Amino acid sequence: MFKGSIVAIVTPFNNGAVDEKKLRELVDFQIENGTDAIVACGTTGESSTLDNEEHLNVIKIVFDQAKGRVPVIAGTGSNSTAEAIHLTREAKEIGVAGVLLVTPYYNKPTQEGLYLHYTAIADAVEIPQILYNVPGRTGVNLLPETVARLAGHKNIVAIKEATGSLQQASEVMALCGDQIDVFSGDDFITFPMMACGAKGVISVTANIMPKAIGDLTDAFYAGDLEKARQLHLDTLKISNAMFIESNPVPVKTALALMGKCSDEVRLPLAPMSAANKAKLEAIMKEYKLI
C-alpha cells in the first residue's frame, strides 16, 4: 500500500503559532524532490505539543497542499485509546490515506494492553493503520509476537519499527510474513532493513535531503543494490547528526540553516546548544546543504 521514502515532516512555527505558509512550502519541497508519501503530526511534527485543533489543522494543511500528488498519512496516536480513536476518525474525515499510531506512552501498558488498544482503534475506524514502535521515547516495546497478533486485522497494514534493532525488525518480518508491511523508523538502518524485506523508511533525514533518501529506496526497488548501499553509507553521517539532540531539534535547526523555516520548537524542547549547532553546521557544509 505504502512504500519507499516517506517523510515525517516537521511542523514549522512562527512566534508560537503554526506557520502555514512555510508548512505548505515544505510539502511542495518534498513532493518536488521525489518523496513518496508524507506523515503529518508524527514525532518529528511535534504532535505531543500541538493542541487538538492545531493537530487536525496541520493534517488538513498538509493534505490540502499535497493535492493528491502523494499519499498523506496522519499521526493520530495517543496514550488515551479514546483520544486515538477520535483523532483517527477526524483524520479519516479529512481524507488522508492512512494513519500512524504511536504506542501509548507513559502509561506503560502490558503487551495485552497494547493489543487491546490497537484492536479497539482498528475496530472503530476503517482506514489503513500503521503501528509505530519507538520504545526509546514511549517507555514500552511492542514485541514481535504482539505485532503478529495484530497483523491479522484488515485495517492494520504496516508497522514503523523504530527500535533501532535489526534483530527485532527481522523477527517481526519472520513472524508476520506478508500480513503486514514493515518500515524502518531509523534512517541509519533503512538499507539493511530493506534487505530483510522492509518496504521503505519513515524518515527524519528526508526533511533536508528528500532526493537522496528517495534515490536510496528507488535504487533498491530498481534492483541497483550497489547504488542503494552507497547512498546508505553516504547519508549515514547526516542521518546520525539528526539525533545529536532530541528530534526534531536538529532537523529544525538544519532546515533553518537552509532557509526553509524557523528552528522554533515548543517547550519542553529547547533550542539547540551552540556547540551542537556548530557541529551540525559543519556536517551540513560537508554535504553542501548550506
From Swiss-Prot:
Instruction: Give compartment(s).
Output: Cytoplasm
- Positions binding pyruvate in this chain are 44, 202
Q: In which pathway does it act?
A: Amino-acid biosynthesis; L-lysine biosynthesis via DAP pathway; (S)-tetrahydrodipicolinate from L-aspartate: step 3/4
Q: Does the keyword NAD apply?
A: no
GO molecular function terms noted in the UniProt entry? 4-hydroxy-tetrahydrodipicolinate synthase activity
Report the CDD domains cross-referenced here: DHDPS (cd00950)
The EC number on file is: 4.3.3.7
PROSITE patterns, A to Z? DHDPS_1, DHDPS_2
Which residues carry out catalysis? Answer: 132 (proton donor/acceptor), 160 (schiff-base intermediate with substrate)
Query: Which keywords describe this protein according to UniProt?
Result: Amino-acid biosynthesis, Cytoplasm, Diaminopimelate biosynthesis, Lyase, Lysine biosynthesis, Schiff base
Q: What class of enzyme is it?
A: lyase
Q: Which InterPro entries match?
A: Aldolase_TIM, DapA, DapA-like, Schiff_base-form_aldolases_AS, Schiff_base-form_aldolases_CS
Biological process per Gene Ontology, one example term: diaminopimelate biosynthetic process
Coarse class of the primary localization is cytoplasm
Determine the domain of life of the protein's source: Bacteria
Q: What does this protein do?
A: Catalyzes the condensation of (S)-aspartate-beta-semialdehyde [(S)-ASA] and pyruvate to 4-hydroxy-tetrahydrodipicolinate (HTPA).
Q: How does it assemble?
A: Homotetramer; dimer of dimers.
Q: PANTHER family in the record, alphabetically?
A: 4-HYDROXY-2-OXOGLUTARATE ALDOLASE, MITOCHONDRIAL, DIHYDRODIPICOLINATE SYNTHASE
Indicate what this protein is called per its UniProt record.
Answer: 4-hydroxy-tetrahydrodipicolinate synthase
Q: Which organism was this protein described from?
A: Trichlorobacter lovleyi (strain ATCC BAA-1151 / DSM 17278 / SZ)
Q: What is the lineage of its organism?
A: Bacteria, Pseudomonadati, Thermodesulfobacteriota, Desulfuromonadia, Geobacterales
